[in-house]
Structure formats: structure tokens, C-alpha cells
Amino acid sequence: LQKNRFHVILFNNMNANRRTHTAENLQQRGPCTLKIQESAENYLEAILVLMQKNGQVRSIDVAHYTGFSKPSISRAVGLLRDNGYVSIDQNGLLGLTEAGLKIAETIYERHTVLTAFLTALGVDHEIAAEDACRIEHVLSPETFEKLKAHAKEYIENKQ
């Protein structure tokens, strides 16, 4: 691997779409060459959501939340840890590193904005959340910011 470049190879069994993203594409925060797969983004987002909900997160919690097997989650979490996105303490509790937190927060914001916008357009909430989960990974920062501004205006004017 090149210096300052990390690859996370995680396969999402439910998604044969193996898109690779850079943190640079997700957030305009300088020349980062970090690459991460869509499935890894989903795991980081799941850890963030569970941390906000429960305070503490274990691999089994991520398995229950995502519907994946414990061995699959353990492998994914190990790769995320090895690549500097997740920490695991002596009690098996998961945490997000600064790099992992940035990615998780970015994906979570995209998910919530897209879900709210699609719901405001009249899409059933469950379908909107599923669609948002697919869309959140492919939008450029510019497109997302424009869509977020439009969604905010649309939702405010609709009320």
C-alpha cells in the first residue's frame, strides 16, 4: 500500500455494488487519500447510531442492528480497527476513531437529510430510509449540499 493510503475491503453480502469512496469525496476537508468501501461506511454509521442510542456498542449489537452474522461483523470490525476507523477496548466495546467518526457523521447526515426529503415528497418512511441508504454513498459533496439546501427550503415551505 502507498504511504497514507488505507484500503478497507469489506463485502456487503446484500450489496454486490462495491463502490469505493474517498473521505475527500465525502467531505471537503483537505487532500485525504483514504479509501473506504460503501459497506464499511454502513458499519461505521451503524456504530455511530448505536453509540448515540445505547452509549456502549459491542460487535453483537452491530450484528443485530445490521442483520449480518456475528462472524461477518467481527471480521468487518477487525478490518475497520486495523485501518484506523474503530477502536476496541479490553471489554470488547467499540468506539470510533476521529477518522471513523468523520465518515460516520457524514454518512449519517446524508441519510437523515435524504430520508426527511423523500418523506416530505410523499414517499413512505420505510422506503425513503431504504432509498436514502443507497443514495447517501454516491452523491458528491456539491450535489449533497445543494440537495440539502433545497430539501430544507422545500420542507419549511410545505409546513
Model-assigned labels for residue ranges:
Residues 106-142:
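Arg/Lys-rich, alpha-helical DNA-contact motif
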Residues 28:
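Cationic, low-complexity basic patches in intrinsically disordered or flexible, solvent-exposed regions
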Residues 92-110:
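Basic, amphipathic "hinge/linker" alpha-helix immediately C-terminal to the N-terminal HTH DNA-binding motif
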Residues 46, 76-79, 85, 99, ...:
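Residue-level recognition of specific faces of alpha-helices
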Residues 13, 32-33:
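Residue-level detector of intrinsically disordered terminal segments
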Residues 59-90:
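Canonical helix-turn-helix DNA-binding module
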Residues 35-68:
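N-terminal helix-turn-helix DNA-binding core of bacterial DNA-binding proteins
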Residues 2-10, 16-24, 130-159:
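C-terminal regulatory/oligomerization modules of transcriptional regulators
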